[in-house]
Amino acid sequence: MKISANSIRTGNILVYNNDLWVVSKTPEHTQPGKGGAYVQVEMKNLKTGTKRNARFSSSDYLEKAELEQKDYQFLYFEGDDLVLMDTKHFDQINIPKEMLEEKLSFLTENMIVKVEFYNDKPLNIELLPTVILEISETDPVIKGATATASYKPAILENGIKVKVPQYLEIGEKIVVKTDDMTYVERAK
Protein backbone atom coordinates (compact mmCIF):
# COMPACT_ATOMS: atom_id res chain seq x y z
CA MET A 1 0.00 0.00 0.00
CA LYS A 2 1.38 3.42 -0.95
CA ILE A 3 1.45 6.20 1.63
CA SER A 4 2.43 9.84 1.37
CA ALA A 5 5.77 10.86 2.90
CA ASN A 6 3.76 13.24 5.12
CA SER A 7 1.82 10.24 6.52
CA ILE A 8 4.90 8.36 7.77
CA ARG A 9 4.74 7.67 11.52
CA THR A 10 7.04 6.09 14.10
CA GLY A 11 6.70 2.29 13.93
CA ASN A 12 5.64 2.22 10.25
CA ILE A 13 7.39 -0.49 8.25
CA LEU A 14 8.36 0.65 4.78
CA VAL A 15 9.63 -1.22 1.73
CA TYR A 16 12.62 0.92 0.70
CA ASN A 17 15.36 -0.19 -1.73
CA ASN A 18 13.83 -3.72 -1.69
CA ASP A 19 14.37 -4.04 2.08
CA LEU A 20 12.07 -3.65 5.07
CA TRP A 21 12.76 -0.60 7.24
CA VAL A 22 11.03 0.43 10.47
CA VAL A 23 10.68 4.15 11.21
CA SER A 24 12.51 4.51 14.54
CA LYS A 25 12.00 8.20 15.37
CA THR A 26 9.25 10.72 14.76
CA PRO A 27 9.76 12.05 11.20
CA GLU A 28 10.77 15.71 10.92
CA HIS A 29 8.66 17.76 8.51
CA THR A 30 10.73 20.65 7.15
CA GLN A 31 9.74 23.61 4.98
CA PRO A 32 12.99 25.34 3.97
CA GLY A 33 12.95 28.94 2.78
CA LYS A 34 14.15 27.84 -0.63
CA GLY A 35 13.12 24.61 -2.34
CA GLY A 36 10.34 22.14 -1.65
CA ALA A 37 9.20 20.77 1.68
CA TYR A 38 10.65 17.44 2.76
CA VAL A 39 10.37 14.80 5.46
CA GLN A 40 13.52 13.59 7.28
CA VAL A 41 13.08 9.99 8.46
CA GLU A 42 15.33 7.86 10.69
CA MET A 43 14.87 4.19 9.81
CA LYS A 44 16.29 0.85 10.94
CA ASN A 45 16.78 -2.06 8.55
CA LEU A 46 14.89 -5.06 9.94
CA LYS A 47 17.29 -7.56 8.36
CA THR A 48 20.68 -6.05 9.21
CA GLY A 49 19.81 -3.71 12.09
CA THR A 50 21.64 -0.78 10.48
CA LYS A 51 20.18 2.70 10.87
CA ARG A 52 20.00 5.40 8.23
CA ASN A 53 18.45 8.78 7.65
CA ALA A 54 16.45 9.29 4.49
CA ARG A 55 14.96 12.47 3.07
CA PHE A 56 11.74 12.31 1.07
CA SER A 57 9.93 15.08 -0.75
CA SER A 58 6.50 15.84 0.72
CA SER A 59 5.00 14.78 -2.60
CA ASP A 60 6.73 11.34 -2.59
CA TYR A 61 4.78 8.13 -2.05
CA LEU A 62 6.40 5.14 -0.37
CA GLU A 63 5.41 1.50 -0.12
CA LYS A 64 4.14 0.61 3.36
CA ALA A 65 4.57 -3.12 4.06
CA GLU A 66 1.28 -5.06 4.22
CA LEU A 67 1.43 -6.57 7.68
CA GLU A 68 -0.81 -9.05 9.40
CA GLN A 69 -1.46 -8.07 13.01
CA LYS A 70 -2.31 -10.58 15.75
CA ASP A 71 -2.89 -10.24 19.48
CA TYR A 72 -0.44 -12.12 21.70
CA GLN A 73 -0.10 -12.41 25.45
CA PHE A 74 3.36 -12.02 27.01
CA LEU A 75 4.09 -15.08 29.16
CA TYR A 76 7.75 -14.96 30.27
CA PHE A 77 11.40 -14.39 29.30
CA GLU A 78 13.45 -17.36 28.08
CA GLY A 79 17.11 -16.41 27.66
CA ASP A 80 17.24 -13.58 25.09
CA ASP A 81 13.69 -14.24 23.91
CA LEU A 82 10.16 -13.28 24.88
CA VAL A 83 7.65 -16.12 24.94
CA LEU A 84 4.27 -14.98 23.61
CA MET A 85 0.99 -16.88 23.22
CA ASP A 86 -1.57 -16.30 20.46
CA THR A 87 -4.78 -15.25 22.23
CA LYS A 88 -7.01 -17.08 19.72
CA HIS A 89 -5.19 -20.33 18.92
CA PHE A 90 -2.94 -20.56 22.02
CA ASP A 91 0.18 -21.18 19.88
CA GLN A 92 3.41 -20.00 21.49
CA ILE A 93 6.19 -18.14 19.69
CA ASN A 94 9.63 -16.91 20.74
CA ILE A 95 10.66 -13.40 19.70
CA PRO A 96 14.08 -11.80 20.37
CA LYS A 97 14.11 -9.18 23.16
CA GLU A 98 15.88 -6.64 20.95
CA MET A 99 12.71 -6.30 18.86
CA LEU A 100 11.30 -4.14 21.68
CA GLU A 101 14.55 -2.26 22.45
CA GLU A 102 14.02 0.44 25.11
CA LYS A 103 10.31 -0.37 25.47
CA LEU A 104 11.17 -3.78 26.95
CA SER A 105 10.89 -2.37 30.48
CA PHE A 106 7.19 -1.59 29.90
CA LEU A 107 6.41 -5.27 29.33
CA THR A 108 4.55 -6.90 32.21
CA GLU A 109 3.39 -10.47 32.72
CA ASN A 110 0.15 -11.33 30.85
CA MET A 111 0.22 -8.01 28.92
CA ILE A 112 -1.53 -8.16 25.54
CA VAL A 113 0.68 -6.94 22.68
CA LYS A 114 0.16 -6.71 18.93
CA VAL A 115 2.68 -8.65 16.83
CA GLU A 116 3.03 -7.66 13.19
CA PHE A 117 3.90 -10.35 10.68
CA TYR A 118 5.26 -9.98 7.13
CA ASN A 119 5.13 -13.22 5.11
CA ASP A 120 4.48 -15.17 8.37
CA LYS A 121 7.66 -13.77 9.99
CA PRO A 122 7.29 -11.63 13.15
CA LEU A 123 8.68 -8.15 12.47
CA ASN A 124 7.45 -5.77 15.10
CA ILE A 125 5.76 -5.68 18.50
CA GLU A 126 3.41 -2.88 19.47
CA LEU A 127 2.66 -2.24 23.12
CA LEU A 128 -0.45 -0.54 24.45
CA PRO A 129 -0.25 3.25 23.99
CA THR A 130 -0.22 3.78 27.78
CA VAL A 131 0.60 1.70 30.86
CA ILE A 132 -0.04 2.19 34.57
CA LEU A 133 3.08 2.11 36.74
CA GLU A 134 3.92 2.86 40.36
CA ILE A 135 6.36 5.57 41.47
CA SER A 136 9.19 3.90 43.43
CA GLU A 137 11.47 6.92 44.00
CA THR A 138 10.89 10.67 43.91
CA ASP A 139 11.52 13.82 45.94
CA PRO A 140 9.15 14.56 48.84
CA VAL A 141 5.98 16.57 48.22
CA ILE A 142 6.36 20.32 48.63
CA LYS A 143 3.32 22.02 50.16
CA GLY A 144 1.62 24.42 47.77
CA ALA A 145 3.25 22.76 44.74
CA THR A 146 -0.12 22.26 43.04
CA ALA A 147 -0.25 25.95 42.13
CA THR A 148 2.68 25.72 39.72
CA ALA A 149 3.16 23.49 36.72
CA SER A 150 6.66 22.39 37.69
CA TYR A 151 7.89 18.82 37.43
CA LYS A 152 10.33 16.68 39.40
CA PRO A 153 12.20 13.50 38.42
CA ALA A 154 10.74 10.14 39.45
CA ILE A 155 11.86 6.54 39.02
CA LEU A 156 9.08 4.05 38.29
CA GLU A 157 8.79 0.41 39.38
CA ASN A 158 10.34 -0.72 36.06
CA GLY A 159 13.38 1.58 36.46
CA ILE A 160 12.31 4.19 33.91
CA LYS A 161 12.89 7.85 34.79
CA VAL A 162 10.07 10.30 34.03
CA LYS A 163 9.17 13.85 35.02
CA VAL A 164 6.06 14.00 37.22
CA PRO A 165 4.13 16.88 38.86
CA GLN A 166 5.41 18.06 42.26
CA TYR A 167 2.35 16.80 44.17
CA LEU A 168 2.88 13.07 43.40
CA GLU A 169 4.33 10.78 46.08
CA ILE A 170 6.12 7.42 46.25
CA GLY A 171 3.64 4.55 45.88
CA GLU A 172 1.18 6.43 43.66
CA LYS A 173 0.24 4.91 40.32
CA ILE A 174 0.51 7.00 37.16
CA VAL A 175 -0.28 6.59 33.46
CA VAL A 176 2.78 6.74 31.17
CA LYS A 177 2.93 6.88 27.35
CA THR A 178 4.93 3.95 25.97
CA ASP A 179 6.05 5.71 22.79
CA ASP A 180 7.89 8.66 24.38
CA MET A 181 7.97 7.59 28.07
CA THR A 182 6.17 10.68 29.37
CA TYR A 183 3.73 11.22 32.24
CA VAL A 184 0.05 11.50 31.23
CA GLU A 185 -1.99 11.59 34.45
CA ARG A 186 -2.52 10.05 37.87
CA ALA A 187 -4.07 6.58 37.51
CA LYS A 188 -7.74 6.38 38.42
UniProtKB/Swiss-Prot annotation:
Its main location: cytoplasm. One of its GO terms (biological process) is peptide biosynthetic process. It is found in: Cytoplasm. Keywords: Cytoplasm, Elongation factor, Protein biosynthesis. Pathway: Protein biosynthesis; polypeptide chain elongation. GO terms for cellular component: cytoplasm. The keyword Protein biosynthesis applies. GO terms for molecular function: translation elongation factor activity. Involved in peptide bond synthesis. Stimulates efficient translation and peptide-bond synthesis on native or reconstituted 70S ribosomes in vitro. Probably functions indirectly by altering the affinity of the ribosome for aminoacyl-tRNA, thus increasing their reactivity as acceptors for peptidyl transferase. PANTHER family: ELONGATION FACTOR P, TRANSLATION ELONGATION FACTOR KOW-LIKE DOMAIN-CONTAINING PROTEIN. Belongs to the elongation factor P family. This is Elongation factor P. It comes from Rickettsia massiliae (strain Mtu5).
